[in-house]
């Protein structure tokens, strides 16, 4: 399925209108069924969908990890993801229902977001990863080079998992949470250790994005944008280093200063 479509638009430039074709990000509703019970519909970008399903179910505490999942069957034509699981968290099972998560990740997401996050309050990240400012600038440059769909459409979020030397996975989605869930799902499926890795994110570091980073087990998050006050407070509590406004040869470190040299 195409992740970008071409649409006719009227562009106003230099005092006149002209008809052109513009690239637009595809918006795709994916309904997840767990053991034949409808759980949720996520509006997403239609690529790396199995990664999204595994990452979402684990991140939201529906399952404990990929070992609880026997199979994931993605039916693109109908927009269904059918999951067979050998274990489903009983605490979260009561939240099953026809919920709809939009690409803007608004109030509909909160029903899921706060279910399994309370346990994170006292879970501090013990990452030993340290990054130099020069290494951060190089990683961000590579990240930007891997953001072709964003530059083409301006309508997606990008995320990456990286070591101190290289970017390991890059994922993009119209939903900022989805991009991180895709990273999480891929890492879980591959058995990739994350405690010595960092997250690079294209957008604002909100409290939700900070929590996603904590769930991934990463001790550093990097962004071209800024964190919110709540995200900084949570980062200090969870021992996560937040670095924002990475542009050109400057950056701001908001928490976890000892990991950046």
Curated annotation (Swiss-Prot):
Q: Which residues bind Mo-bis(molybdopterin guanine dinucleotide)?
A: 245-250
- Active-site residues? 105
- Major subcellular location class: cytoplasm
Query: Which terms in the GO cellular component ontology are assigned?
Result: cytoplasm
Q: Which family does it belong to?
A: Belongs to the FdhD family.
- Protein name in UniProt: Sulfur carrier protein FdhD
| Role | Required for formate dehydrogenase (FDH) activity. Acts as a sulfur carrier protein that transfers sulfur from IscS to the molybdenum cofactor prior to its insertion into FDH.
The GO terms describing molecular function are: sulfur carrier activity; sulfurtransferase activity
Q: Pfam families this protein is in? A: FdhD-NarQ
Print the keywords alphabetically. Cytoplasm, Molybdenum cofactor biosynthesis
What is the top-level taxon of the source organism? Bacteria
What organism does the record attribute this protein to? Listeria innocua serovar 6a (strain ATCC BAA-680 / CLIP 11262)
A GO BP entry: Mo-molybdopterin cofactor biosynthetic process
Does the record carry ATP-binding as a key word? no
PANTHER family membership: FORMATE DEHYDROGENASE, SULFUR CARRIER PROTEIN FDHD
């Amino acid at each position: 399925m195409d992740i970008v479509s071409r649409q006719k638009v009227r562009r106003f430039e230099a005092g006149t209108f002209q008809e052109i074709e513009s690239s637009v990000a595809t918006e795709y509703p994916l309904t997840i069924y767990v053991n034949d019970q409808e759980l949720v519909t996520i509006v997403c970008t239609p690529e790396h969908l199995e990664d999204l399903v595994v990452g979402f179910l684990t991140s939201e505490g529906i399952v404990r990890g990929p070992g609880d999942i026997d199979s994931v069957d993605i039916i693109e034509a109908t927009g269904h993801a059918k999951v067979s699981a050998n274990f489903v968290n009983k605490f979260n099972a009561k939240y099953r229902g026809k919920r709809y998560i939009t690409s803007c990740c608004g109030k509909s997401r909160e029903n899921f977001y706060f279910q399994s996050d309370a346990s994170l309050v006292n879970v501090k990240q013990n990452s030993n990863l340290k990054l130099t400012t020069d290494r951060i600038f190089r990683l961000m440059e590579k990240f930007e080079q891997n953001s072709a769909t964003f530059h083409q459409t301006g309508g997606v979020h990008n995320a990456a998992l990286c070591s101190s030397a290289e970017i390991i996975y890059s994922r993009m989605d119209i939903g900022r949470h989805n991009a991180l869930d895709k990273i999480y799902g891929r890492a879980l499926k591959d058995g990739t250790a994350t405690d010595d890795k960092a997250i690079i994110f294209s957008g604002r570091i909100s409290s939700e994005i900070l929590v996603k980073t904590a769930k991934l087990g990463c001790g550093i998050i990097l962004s071209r944008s800024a964190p919110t006050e709540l995200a900084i407070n949570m980062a200090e509590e969870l021992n996560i280093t937040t670095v924002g406004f990475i542009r050109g040869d400057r950056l701001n470190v908001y928490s976890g200063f000892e990991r950046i040299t």
